[in-house]
Amino acid sequence: MTRHRRCRMRRKTRLRLRAPVVTLFLLACLLSLDGTGVLRTGLLCAILHESAHALVYRKLWHRWPDLTLSPFGICLQLRGVPMTPEEELRLASAGPLANLLACCTVLLYMQTAGQYSYSGYWFACTNLLVGGANLLPLPGLDGAHILHGMFYSLDKRHRI
């Protein structure tokens, strides 16, 4: 018996810009006015959050997702992707978990090394803010998807 090798086409991640002129203009203006680094830290935390979603997406479906950058943030395009509630739970919880892990890592490093810094605390707090805001159970945020996956799992366990 011979085994057939699965040939997977490697597809690059596409980054789509919604209202590209407005998005890039706002980003350039805000970054040029960001003297304290608040926006850069928030942008780094948002990229970390979405990267975790993209890595879990890659692990589950063996391809990279399409990303959309708009004036309101970065999001993964999931239209047309068949997803079980368990996969939805894994995918939705990856971003907030990455933010929590980054926060704990920075705080633990500062505690063990004895090197406390304002920027370290700011990075930790911003990660908590990004992760916590995404845990709100509002449509479009990770919290709604996590609740859907959890309720489905609980409902499935208690059926007779």
Residue locations for each model-derived region?
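Hydrophobic transmembrane alpha-helices and their immediate loop junctions
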Residues: 1-160
